[in-house]
A protein has these predicted regions:
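Conserved residues at the C-terminal ends of beta-strands
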Residues: 257
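Active-site-proximal, substrate-binding regions of enzyme catalytic domains
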Residues: 2-250, 260-301
Length: 301
């Protein structure tokens, strides 16, 4: 089966259009396709409960109740990006075999339990701390990207002078800059390991197309670095958008209503197809028609 990854904008539209989960999933299955739900999608819906605005909270409640229909159909949930990176690193070093990019049954049930707690208004302190930490991570990622470029003027010059066609070629190449960026992610997840040993892991991960999350993470960082170098900065929510793209790294089609999001996916995830819908399009019909005819589909680099 091939998997579709819809970003949060797609699930919002499906909810507002009252798309029937059973009918849609059945129709996709006839085409050997199925949804994969990104953990980042659920995160963005759940954070509505932490705004302090009742209207936004109600919106989050509506969305999560809608998503529960898909969870009752056992639509797979992609593991968090950090978990994918850890499992790929353990696999490439022969420490532990990577079983799946999807949450197992126990982890799946944990998600459902946490959603039910939110819907009942049960919000534990550690949950609040998690959302605060995630917001800080996005801000740190954006600042770290700019700091990395400022610390490497040579790299900044190379990226800043590269055309869009040239950056596409750069993303296909296992270069030291990419390994350095991946090393930063690995050091965060394996703080007790030496930078030297993790540098070897980064090199191994980027040498094999098997490790799709590591490669997507690196390519996304390089692409954002290029945009930062050519434009001087990147918009505040762009690093958060890349969480979706990396989450889709083991999927076959990335679906969104945002052209810029699709552009990032095409640059970051090798071989992925993208579908971009207008805000007023019927998503269910559009999905089935586009996939059946192959229209409006672009393939990754």
């Amino acid at each position: 089966m091939r998997y579709l990854y819809g970003d949060t904008s797609i699930w919002n539209r499906l909810c507002d259009q009252d798309a029937d989960p059973n009918e849609l999933c059945s129709a996709l299955a006839l085409r050997d396709l199925g949804f994969a739900i990104g953990y980042n999608v659920l995160y963005e819906m759940a954070k509505s409960f932490f705004t302090g605005t009742e209207q936004v909270t109600e919106r989050g409640r509506k969305l999560l109740n809608y998503m529960k229909h898909y969870l009752s159909l056992h639509v797979p949930i992609v593991k968090e990006n950090w978990a994918l990176l850890v499992e790929e690193a353990l696999d490439v070093t022969g420490t532990a075999k990577m079983e799946s990019c999807f949450r197992n049954s126990s982890q799946y049930e944990d998600v459902i339990k946490e959603i039910d707690k939110l819907l009942r208004g049960e919000i534990a302190r550690e949950v609040v701390e998690f959302f605060a930490g995630r917001k800080s991570l996005v801000r740190t990622s954006r600042d770290a990207l700019k700091d990395q470029l400022d610390a490497r003027p040579g790299v900044k010059t190379i990226l800043g002078s590269a055309s869009e066609e040239a950056i596409a070629d750069l993303l296909r190449t296992d270069i030291i800059v990419g390994r350095t960026m991946l090393l930063g992610h690995l050091r965060r997840e394996f703080p007790k390991n030496s930078p030297e040993s993790l540098a070897v892991v980064a090199k191994l991960l980027l040498q094999s197309p098997k490790y799709r999350a590591s490669r997507a993470m690196t390519r996304a960082d390089l692409y954002l670095a290029w945009r930062c170098a050519t434009r001087g900065s990147i918009r505040a929510d762009l690093p958060d958008d890349t969480f979706h793209v990396v989450s889709a790294s083991y999927c076959d089609v990335f679906v969104t209503t945002e052209a810029d999001q699709a552009d990032i996916a095409l640059h970051a995830v090798e071989g992925i197809e993208t579908l971009v819908f207008n805000q007023d399009e019927n998503i269910s019909d559009g999905l089935l028609n586009s996939i059946q005819t192959g229209s409006a589909v672009q393939s990754g680099l």
